Amino acid sequence: KKKKKTVVIVGLGPAGLFCALTLARNYTDTKVIIIERGEPVERRGQAIGALFHRRKLSETSNLCYGEGGAGTWSDGKLTTRIGRNGEQVKDVFKTFVEFGAPPEILQMGKPHLGTDRMVKILRNARYHLEEMGCEIMFDETCRAVIVEDNKAVGVTTESGKTIDAEAVVLATGHSSRALFEQLSNDGVLLEFQSFASGFRIEHPQELLNELQYGDRFAKEVERGKGRIPVADYRVAHTNKADNRGVFSFCMCPG
């Protein structure tokens, strides 16, 4: 029997999850091993509850670390600026539906999953990966990438394991600073991502309703008859002189 190739994925956030799904479904000759420093989403929820209610912080299982990544405990808005009707985006939405999201998100202009659904969706995705033979190592931290002849050939973990691999995918998010430092020290080419700074703006909902709908229809919203939803908006501007842009993000009307 031919030995399967091994691919190690570091991180089980959105990038790691969809990378694993793609490999497991399309490359049956590949053994997928996922290393996640945090906990499964169920235990992660317990750790977050302990933080909120008892001020007890787990440094490896919290709002930033764990299955699903940093966005798991957000409100589940599905936003994209790369083409809502592109085939890749459609495939992502269909995958969410496959694992428990409401089918309506395939037609909605502003699809929204909700935090409560994310736990079920992630759990179902994990079960699916395991059924296809993927190995998921929770509570395990990748400490170093083994590089030979300018090629990643495996990883070492905090618990002392060495995992040989034909390829390594780093889907760590932005907070794995020790790993980034190790890669830099080993001469791996790193490229800075552009930096964005954000701040919160609040407007009275009544003001937005009037600005967007005008006086007549704004009153329909205020009467609460349900025929017209509360108004929202999106603004964007690019300074052509230095090609810097500003845009609104994560609008929460109501």
Label each PLM-derived region with a short phrase.
Residues 1-95, 99-254:
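Residues forming the flavin
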